Each structure stands twice: as structure tokens, then as C-alpha cells.
Amino acid sequence: MSKQILILPGDGIGPEIMAEAVKVLELANDKFQLGFSLAHDVIGGAAIDKHGVPLADETLERARKADAVLLGAVGGPKWDKIERDIRPERGLLKIRSQLGLFANLRPAILYPQLADASSLKPEIVSGLDILIVRELTGGIYFGAPRGQRELEGGERQAYDTLPYSESEVRRIARVGFDMARVRGKKLCSVDKANVLASSQLWREVVEDVAKDYPDVELSHMYVDNAAMQLVRAPKQFDVMVTDNMFGDILSDEASMLTGSIGMLPSASLDADNKGMYEPCHGSAPDIAGLGIANPLATILSVSMMLRYSFNQSAAAEAIEKAVSLVLDQGLRTGDIFSEGCRKVGTQEMGDAVVAALRNL
């Protein structure tokens, strides 16, 4: 029986970059005889326009039945004025929570060909390879109660809640330790245990889980210091594990150490490694339709999908090698362009990766 992959291009540049990723996926499917079948649907603003909601029930059901989901990006100014509960981003939060995608893996890798693209000195970032493991379905983004109320005198007050259960922390900690075990055997847990009760529990549980991983070196760091250390000396980190909000912020910061968020993929996994894969960048509505968006993060998300959800490491490595070969050829989209290289658009970059993959 064939494996089912649901394609959700989303909004903004999503359809453009997804078209290139699908070309690469289809070639890998044929080249490595993977037996995938692809289905397409809508999410985010595109779903609001079609169904009136950011994630239709039938789309969610298709995602549940699929073996993996490949997503582009959601959101845009067109939908900024509608009710908060039905904005495009709510579709993304809903599909993550409903599919139980609690573990978000966000690599920050500096390709040697792009060393000049980083805003930091080459000696600080050269060879950078960090993996941030972010808890994705708990914490302040999902906590209740939340809302607004009116205080005496008519002043408005807004409030959110940051809850974490022991089981939520334990399962994401295990993912962090498992990833560290097959990499550099170093795990840094990031929290704010000097202030937050949820972080105090987080640290206690991570320490307990560490007993099962004596071969992994565990350290703890407050989130404010971690944000500073990522800029000061990022290569001290191998795998970082942290909560939903801290991970959201730190992974975006880490991505810019590499020179372009347009290069970075991500994976969101459930307990069985079934997952949703998407680029780290957003929908970039300011360049949508111009044909200049960088498709490499989405193409590399295909590679992550093959590795983590389908255990197809040979196909994953081939895609990564194809991307590296294209960079060796000096092809660059505008976001990673530097003197001496050739600037190309979205489609030409995708075609180049396809050609490189075909010739491997």
C-alpha cells in the first residue's frame, strides 16, 4: 500500500515554493521507488477564502489519515482584520494540536558556501550545526485561561497562562536526549527556572529524564543567557530543548546566524514520528507572486520528512547533496545572494536542484 503525503501550500509564497519542493519530491519518489502518493488541500488564508475557516474538518481528517504533511506557509495582511479565532495562524495551531505534533525540530546549519551571508564573523559561525527541539503543543500558546477583562476604572487587562504537565515535559525531554545521543551527545535545556514555576518543574523533570541517558552531557541555561550565547558563541551548542514560546524565539534567532531563514527546514513530530514538515520562514506576502522566493527550506523539509517519518535516509541525503551542489554552482536567490554568484528565481533554483538530484 502506498504512503500518503498531504500537500498544503498555504498562503503568500507558499504555493510558489511548494511547487518546487513537489518537483523534488516526485523525482525522489521515482528515483528511489518510494511508493508515495500525493494529495493537495488548503490551509490558512486559502482555506478561509474557500471554506470560511483556516482549517476545514475534512482537511484535518485527510491530515490524520496521511503518513506525513508537507506545508508551505500561512498568513498575510489580507486576513489581519478578521476575528482572531479564525485567522490563518489558528489553522496551523489547530493542525499541530489535533495531530499531536508535540516535538518541533528546527536545525540551524551554516552551509560553507553561505558563510559570507551570516551577519556574524566567519570564525564565530563557520561549521555551525545546531538542532533546537521545541515543545509545540503546550505552554503559553495553548494555556487557559486567556483573554481580556475590564478592571475597575475601565482599564483593560490581558492575561495568558503558561502551564506544563510533567508528562509534557518528559516526552519532549526524551526527544531532546534521543537527538543528542545520535549527534554530539550534548543537550542544553533552556528555561527561566529562576522566575517561572513552569520552568522549575521543567528543570526538575529534565534532570530526572537525564538519568536514563548517562552518555549525554546535560546543561541548563536561562533563556535570556541562551539568547545572548547564541550570538556570542553559538558553536558551544549541539542540541537545545526548550518550551513552546522560548523555542519559537530562539529558533528564529538561530536561523539568522546562518544568513537566511530561507534555507532552514523544520519537522513537527508525534509520538510515532508521523509528522508535518515546513520551512521555518513565513508566507512573505511582500514578495508573493514575484517568483523570487527561496524554495530551499521547503525542499530541505522534504529531506527531513524522508528521514524522520519514512526512514529513507539515502533519499534524504541525496536531496541535501543536490542542494549543496547547486550552491557550489554559485546559484543564489536574492536572500542569500553575494558578489560573484548568479541570482536566480524560485523556479530556476528548484529546477537546478531537480537536475542535480537526477544526476546523482
Curated annotation (Swiss-Prot):
Q: In which pathway does it act?
A: Amino-acid biosynthesis; L-leucine biosynthesis; L-leucine from 3-methyl-2-oxobutanoate: step 3/4
Subunit text: Homodimer.
What are the entry keywords? Amino-acid biosynthesis, Branched-chain amino acid biosynthesis, Cytoplasm, Leucine biosynthesis, Magnesium, Manganese, Metal-binding, NAD, Oxidoreductase
- Could you say which protein family the record assigns here? Belongs to the isocitrate and isopropylmalate dehydrogenases family. LeuB type 1 subfamily.
Q: Name one GO cellular component term.
A: cytosol
Q: Which GO terms describe its molecular function?
A: 3-isopropylmalate dehydrogenase activity; magnesium ion binding; NAD binding
InterPro entries for this protein: IsoCit/isopropylmalate_DH_CS (IPR019818), IsoPropMal-DH-like_dom (IPR024084), Isopropylmalate_DH (IPR004429)
Matching entries from PANTHER family are given as: 3-ISOPROPYLMALATE DEHYDROGENASE
Which Gene Ontology biological process is one annotated for this entry? L-leucine biosynthetic process
Q: Which reaction does it catalyse?
A: (2R,3S)-3-isopropylmalate + NAD(+) = 4-methyl-2-oxopentanoate + CO2 + NADH
What are the binding positions for Mg(2+) in this chain?
Answer: 224, 248, 252
**Superkingdom assignment:** Bacteria
User: What species is given as this protein's source?
Assistant: Pseudomonas putida (strain ATCC 47054 / DSM 6125 / CFBP 8728 / NCIMB 11950 / KT2440)
Q: Which cofactor does it need?
A: Mg(2+); Mn(2+)
Q: Which Pfam families match?
A: Iso_dh
Q: Where in the cell is it found?
A: Cytoplasm
The signal peptide stretch is none
- UniProt-listed Enzyme Commission number(s): 1.1.1.85
Q: Where does substrate bind?
A: 96, 106, 134, 224
In terms of Gene3D superfamilies, this protein maps to: Isopropylmalate Dehydrogenase (3.40.718.10)
The function of this protein is: Catalyzes the oxidation of 3-carboxy-2-hydroxy-4-methylpentanoate (3-isopropylmalate) to 3-carboxy-4-methyl-2-oxopentanoate. The product decarboxylates to 4-methyl-2 oxopentanoate.
Binding site residues for NAD(+): 76-89, 282-294
- State what protein this is by name: 3-isopropylmalate dehydrogenase
The record places the site described as Important for catalysis at 141, 192
Instruction: Supply the enzyme class, top level.
Output: oxidoreductase
Q: How is the cofactor bound?
A: Binds 1 Mg(2+) or Mn(2+) ion per subunit.
